[in-house]
């Protein structure tokens, strides 16, 4: 459950280390985002010579949450951190590698690139 002002780790090699959610996209008064939802973020920590700079505003897709994902069979998949993958304006990943596991809930037409780059899909 990601909301405004939530800090997330970045799970790709775009150069950002930490981002902060500034808006949950989709709906006029939408409060929370879960795995697979697109949010607007600002970069709070970045490495030198990365593709993104501190203070930059971008879109991101949530790939891991501490709250977890409930599956139709009743199982629950939780993670140790909240993480996101940065997207460009065409909603394609900025980085070329994904770090850590991602869930099958991303397996839509929009995020197949993230699924294929991920080392582990739960």
Curated annotation (Swiss-Prot):
Keywords, ordered alphabetically: Ribonucleoprotein, Ribosomal protein, RNA-binding, rRNA-binding
Keyword rRNA-binding: yes
GO CC terms of this entry: cytosolic large ribosomal subunit
InterPro entries registered for this protein in UniProt: Ribosomal_uL14, Ribosomal_uL14_bac-type, Ribosomal_uL14_CS, Ribosomal_uL14_sf
Pfam families per the UniProt record, alphabetical: Ribosomal_L14 (PF00238)
Function statement: Binds to 23S rRNA. Forms part of two intersubunit bridges in the 70S ribosome.
Cross-referenced HAMAP family: Ribosomal_uL14
Subunit structure: Part of the 50S ribosomal subunit. Forms a cluster with proteins L3 and L19. In the 70S ribosome, L14 and L19 interact and together make contacts with the 16S rRNA in bridges B5 and B8.
Family of this protein: Belongs to the universal ribosomal protein uL14 family.
Official protein name in the record: Large ribosomal subunit protein uL14
Organism, as annotated: Teredinibacter turnerae (strain ATCC 39867 / T7901)
Gene symbol of the encoding locus: rplN
């Amino acid at each position: 459950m990601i909301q405004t002002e939530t800090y997330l780790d970045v799970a790709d090699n775009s150069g950002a280390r930490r981002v902060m959610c500034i808006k949950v996209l989709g709906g006029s008064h939408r409060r929370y985002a879960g795995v697979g939802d697109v949010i607007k973020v600002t970069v709070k920590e970045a490495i030198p010579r990365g593709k993104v700079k501190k203070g930059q505003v971008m879109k991101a897709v949530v790939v891991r949450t501490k709250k977890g994902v409930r599956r139709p069979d009743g199982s629950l998949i939780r993670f140790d951190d909240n993480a996101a993958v940065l997207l460009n304006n065409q909603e394609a990943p900025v980085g070329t590698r994904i770090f850590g596991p991602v869930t099958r809930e991303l397996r839509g037409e929009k995020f197949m690139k993230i699924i294929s780059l991920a080392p582990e899909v739960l």
